[in-house]
Structures are given as structure tokens and as C-alpha cells.
Amino acid sequence: MSVARTVLITNRRGLHARASAKFVTLASSQRCDVQVEKDGSGSVTGTSIMGLMMLGAAMGDSITISANGDGADEAVTRLAELVEAKFGED
């Protein structure tokens, strides 16, 4: 099963190192493959801090979180909620 959801980055510092680390920790705990894409510029694995940071997602940018495999729906929901909660910042 493949699921995708687009979310808006709303925390002031965007997808920086600490936010990326929180995302990777959660993505790594999922049973499915997680990918993240910004502006159709190609996707990166959701378990790579450097990959996420290389997206350059700043406040006001949208990212698309997609997952494929067992638990994909739950994984995308949980990761989207993390982003929407500003990674616990602000």
C-alpha cells in the first residue's frame, strides 16, 4: 500500500538538523519505506538526516511525505502530525 500527504512547514527554522533528527527517529521506527519530496525536485529517504536537510525546506515550504508497505497510512499520519506540530518547537 502506498500513501502520500503534503504538509506545510510552519516552524520558524524549517527542516533544520534537530527537526530532521526528530523526523528520522520517527520514520526509522516505522515498518514501511518513507520518502520525502519538496517541489518535485526528487525524493530522499525519510531515514536520512542529511537527505532531509538537503531538501532545504524552510518555513512556508511544502513537503510531500510518502510511504510504501505495511503501516504506510499510520506512518504518513504520524509524520505529518510531527511536521504540523512544528516538531515540538516554537
Located regions from the model:
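Intrinsic-disorder/low-complexity, polar/charged segments enriched in Ser/Thr/Lys/Arg/Asp/Glu/Gln
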Residues: 2-6, 62-64
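Compact, glycine-rich, soluble single-domain proteins
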Residues: 8-51, 55-58
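Compositionally biased, disordered extreme N-termini, encompassing classical targeting presequences
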Residues: 1-3, 89-90
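C-terminal structural segments of small proteins and small subunits
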Residues: 56-90
